UniProtKB/Swiss-Prot annotation:
Keywords: Cell membrane, Membrane, Transmembrane, Transmembrane helix. Pfam families: DUF441. It comes from the Bacteria. It is a multi-pass membrane protein. This is UPF0756 membrane protein Dred_1097. HAMAP family: UPF0756 (MF_01874). It is found in: Cell membrane. The chain crosses the membrane at residues 6-26, 52-72, 75-95, 111-131. Belongs to the UPF0756 family. PANTHER family: UPF0756 MEMBRANE PROTEIN YEAL (PTHR38452:SF1). GO terms for cellular component: plasma membrane.
Length: 151
């Protein structure tokens, strides 16, 4: 059995044991694609999968805004509340960190392996959700920046 198949089966098993349907499903889909020799689709997924995933994530978050039953005055009040202002700051910092992570991944793409392993550890042991490598890369960029400050 090829090494990639063993790794994918391991991911499926880890997803099952950790009760992470996302990890198990992703492993299953990749294994089926691999066994079906859908290399072109895998290449497309590798190149554009993150963008497509982020589009669906953004859509799921923005759906409430598309409903007609939103009271915009309440929306503004919530946004200007202390929690809303913290959410604005959090969103601003998160997108900045994601941008820094993307720069880091372009400079040193080999770091993705450590981020994937770290994500798996977070899923299995901390009950985390694999939202994408950009946040992991952004945090890595922040950690590296802090280390450089102390050198």
């Amino acid at each position: 059995m090829q090494r990639a198949n063993i790794i994918l089966l391991s991911l499926i098993l880890m997803g099952y044991l950790a009760e992470s349907a996302l990890l198990a499903t992703a492993g299953c889909i990749l294994l089926v694609m691999r066994l079906s020799k859908l290399n072109r689709l895998m290449f497309l997924l590798e190149r554009r999968g993150l963008e497509v995933g982020l589009i669906f994530l953004m859509l799921s978050v923005l759906v409430p805004l598309a409903h007609d039953n939103i009271v915009y005055k309440e929306l503004v009040m919530k946004t200007l509340s202390p929690q809303g202002l913290l959410a604005l700051i959090g969103g601003t910092l998160a997108t900045h960190m994601n941008g820094e992570g993307l720069k880091l991944l372009k400079l040193d793409p080999q770091l993705i392996f450590g981020m994937v392993i770290g994500s798996l550890i977070g899923i299995v042991f901390l009950g985390g959700i694999p939202i994408g490598p950009l946040m992991a890369a952004g945090l890595t960029a922040l950690f590296l920046e802090v280390i450089y400050w102390f050198k």
